[in-house]
C-alpha cells in the first residue's frame, strides 16, 4: 500500500562508498542466496481500469519490445501476478449496505464476489462471479503470456464481515473484522481459489488472507480498502484458511503471511503468531515500505530458521527517477535475500507507477526512468537463476546454470569511474577476449536502456565505465561455477 516515501537525502546509501578511483568487485561464485522465483505486480488497482489492454499485457508480462506511444519499450517480463479479492459491493443485504469512505477513489474499490451472508455455497445467488472482469482479464492475459506464479490476496474482508460495514477500516484504526466472521473470511478466499482453478484456468500457488494487518492507519475515512487485524485473530484466520483450502482439495496451495508494511513490524508479527500459525505458512511475505531502514536481516533469519520461502511482496514509492528503487532493491538482495519481488502499481500517477497513468480517468502516459531501471533487473535476472553474493553493496549477481551465463547488475552512485569485475572464483570465467554484453540506464534522465558490446573479458576480469548515478547490467556467457 502507498505510504509516505523517503526524501532523496534518505535513500539508504550510507553503506555505499562514493569514490572516483577505479573499484574492483569480486563475484562470490560459491555463494547461494536462493533460486529466483520471479518479478511481479499486484493487479489492484490498475488492472481494474486497463485490464482489457493487450499492449499493456505485452509490456508487463513479456520480454518482447513493444511500440507504445511511438516509443519502443523493452518488456519487463514479469511472471508473478497478485490478484486482489475485493471487499466492496453495491448490493445491500437486507437493511444493511456498505459504508463508503468519503476519501476513497472509485478505482480503489474492488468489487467482491460474496455479496451477502445468506449462503456460503459459491453456486448460490449469494455469489457474483461476473464482477471485477478487467482484473481477471489481465490475470488471464498474463497467464497466456507465460506468467506462472499467481497469488490471491485480500486487503479487507467483505464489507459485511467488518464491524462497521466499511472496508476501509475502523473509525480509530482498530480491529475491524467481526469475531464470528473470521472463519467466513477464510471461506471467502478458499472459494475464490477453488473457483479460479475450476473456471478461470488459474491455479493460485499461494493465498494471503492479510495485508499490513498490524497497521493502525486503516480507518473509516481511508483512501483504500484495508483492515487492522490483531495478532491473535491473524493466527485464527490462518488456521481456518488452511482447513478451508484442504476441504476443497487445494492442499497444494500454501498460505503466505502477513504482508506487514515494514521489515521491523514483520519481525514482531512473526515472533508473535505462534507455532500453530507459522506451521501453516509456506512463505513469509513482507512489504518494502521501510525503504532504506529496517531489520531486513531479522526477517531473513526467521525465514531461514523456519525453513520458509521469502518474498518482498509489495514495494512502491513516488520517485520516478529510479534512484530509490535501485537503492532499496539492491539492499533487499543484499540483506533480505528474497526469492521474489513485486512492484505495487506498475501503472499509477505521481511517480508511483513505472508508467504514468490515471486509473480513474482511464488515461495512460509515458514510461518514466524507473521503468527502465526495473527492466535492468527483471529482464536479466530471470526465474530459475541462482542468486549470488555480488561482492559489494552496489552489485547484484545471478547465475543461469542451464545456459552457463552470469548476470551482474551494478549501480555507481559516486563520480564517474571504471568498475572492474573479477570472476576468478568461477571454475570457468568465460574466455579471454569474449564479448560482455552491456545495458545502461541513467538515473533521473538520459540513457534509458542502451545496449552495447564494446566490453570484453581480459583474463578473468572485465572493466566497464560508469557515469555517476548509472545502472548497468552485464551478461557474460560461457561461465561455469
Each language-model region and where it sits:
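Active-site neighborhood of glycoside hydrolase catalytic domains
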Residues: 184-203, 213-318
Amino acid at each position: 500500500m502507498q505510504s509516505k516515501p523517503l526524501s532523496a537525502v534518505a535513500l539508504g546509501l550510507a553503506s555505499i562508498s562514493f569514490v572516483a578511483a577505479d573499484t574492483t568487485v569480486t563475484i562470490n561464485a560459491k555463494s547461494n542466496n536462493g533460486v529466483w522465483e520471479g518479478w511481479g505486480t499486484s493487479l489492484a488497482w490498475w488492472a481494474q481500469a486497463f485490464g482489457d489492454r493487450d499492449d499493456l499485457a505485452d509490456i508487463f508480462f513479456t520480454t518482447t519490445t513493444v511500440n507504445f506511444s511511438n516509443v519502443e519499450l523493452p518488456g519487463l517480463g514479469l511472471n508473478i501476478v497478485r490478484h486482489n479479492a475485493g471487499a466492496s459491493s453495491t448490493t445491500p443485504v437486507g437493511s444493511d449496505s456498505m459504508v463508503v469512505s468519503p476519501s476513497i477513489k472509485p478505482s480503489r474499490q474492488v468489487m467482491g464476489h460474496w455479496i451477502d451472508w445468506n449462503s456460503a455455497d459459491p453456486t448460490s445467488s449469494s455469489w457474483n462471479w461476473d464482477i471485477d472482469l478487467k482484473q481477471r482479464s489481465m490475470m488471464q492475459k498474463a497467464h497466456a503470456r507465460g506468467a506462472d506464479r499467481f497469488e490471491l490476496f485480500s486487503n479487507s474482508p467483505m464489507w459485511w464481515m467488518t464491524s462497521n460495514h466499511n472496508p476501509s477500516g475502523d473509525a480509530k484504526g482498530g480491529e475491524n473484522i467481526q469475531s464470528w466472521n473470521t472463519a467466513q473470511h477464510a471461506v471467502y478466499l478458499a472459494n475464490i481459489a477453488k473457483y479460479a482453478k475450476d473456471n478461470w484456468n488459474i491455479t493460485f500457488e499461494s493465498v494471503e488472507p492479510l495485508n499490513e494487518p498490524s497497521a493502525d492507519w486503516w480507518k473509516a475515512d481511508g483512501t483504500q480498502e484495508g483492515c487492522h487485524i490483531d495478532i491473535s485473530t491473524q493466527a485464527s484466520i490462518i488456521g481456518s484458511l488452511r482447513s478451508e483450502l484442504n476441504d476443497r482439495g487445494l492442499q497444494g496451495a500454501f498460505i503466505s503471511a502477513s504482508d506487514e508494511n515494514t521489515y521491523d513490524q514483520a519481525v514482531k508479527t512473526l515472533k508473535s503468531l505462534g507455532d500453530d500459525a507459522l506451521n501453516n505458512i509456506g512463505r513469509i511475505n513482507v512489504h518494502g515500505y521501510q525503504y532504506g531502514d529496517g531489520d531486513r536481516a531479522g526477517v531473513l533469519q526467521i525465514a531461514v530458521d523456519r525453513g520458509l520461502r521469502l518474498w518482498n511482496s509489495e514495494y512502491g514509492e513516488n520517485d520516478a527517477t529510479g534512484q530509490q528503487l535501485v537503492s532499496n532493491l539492491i539492499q533487499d538482495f543484499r540483506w533480505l535475500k528474497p526469492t521474489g519481488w513485486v512492484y505495487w502499481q506498475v501503472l499509477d500517477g505521481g511517480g508511483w507507477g513505472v508508467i504514468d497513468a490515471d486509473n480513474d480517468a482511464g488515461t495512460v502516459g509515458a514510461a518514466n526512468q524507473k521503468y527502465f531501471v526495473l527492466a535492468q533487473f527483471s529482464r536479466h535476472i530471470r526465474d530459475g537463476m541462482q542468486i549470488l553474493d555480488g561482492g559489494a553493496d552496489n552489485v547484484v549477481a545471478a547465475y543461469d546454470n542451464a545456459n552457463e551465463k552470469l548476470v551482474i547488475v551494478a549501480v555507481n552512485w559516486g563520480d564517474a569511474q571504471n568498475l572492474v569485475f573479477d570472476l576468478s572464483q568461477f571454475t570457468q570465467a568465460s574466455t579471454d577476449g569474449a564479448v560482455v554484453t552491456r545495458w545502461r540506464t541513467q538515473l533521473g534522465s538520459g540513457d534509458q536502456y542502451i545496449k552495447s558490446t564494446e566490453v570484453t573479458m581480459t583474463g578473468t576480469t572485465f572493466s566497464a565505465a560508469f557515469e555517476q548515478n548509472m545502472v548497468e547490467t552485464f551478461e557474460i556467457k560461457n561461465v561455469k561455477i
